[in-house]
Amino acid sequence: MAMFDEDVGCDATPQLLSRRGALLAGLAMAVVVQPAMSRPHKGLRVLFICQSGTAKSAIAREVFRRRARQRGMAVTVFSRGIVLADHVSPPLRRKLAADGIDPAADPATVLERRDWQQADIVVAFNPLPGEVRPLHLRDWSSLGSLNDDYARARPDLDRRIEALLDEIASDDRRASP
């Protein structure tokens, strides 16, 4: 009685797997288990808010979306502005294009009550209006201007996004049985 189908080429007995069979079984487990472990909080909603809705929040949305996708994380990410205005300068637009980031990928939208009420995590780049009181707020108002100093602000934004993704993934691992 063989443990594996002979068509696969593994002739291990029930008592002992060959090294090749054990290696193949281990690789198969890694391929099957790893993607499931890297998909935290299916349906988690992350909201980025900045004053204009077109610069920091929109850029963070696109960077977060890309990084979450690379990690295989199923999260919804969106951005809003307190008062809409186009604050992406032509030099910043060129730098973003060179990095493959399109802050206009989603239309700029003004912040509404339902946005922050439906979000699981809210990241604010500016002080929020008094009536906006999200439960899980991250204050990123200390991030420098992407228009004025992209070379310094972008790596800072990247670090913050990676830390938030790590936190979400860590929370998911703790919540999984």
Describe the residue ranges of each PLM region.
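Phosphate-binding/catalytic loops
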Residues: 127-177
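A short, aliphatic-rich alpha-helical micro-motif
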Residues: 116-117
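N-terminal export leaders
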Residues: 16-24
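Conserved active-site segments centered on acidic
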Residues: 39-112
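N-terminal signal peptide c-region/cleavage motif recognized by signal peptidases
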Residues: 33-35
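N-terminal secretory signal peptides
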Residues: 1-17, 31
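Conserved acidic residues
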Residues: 120
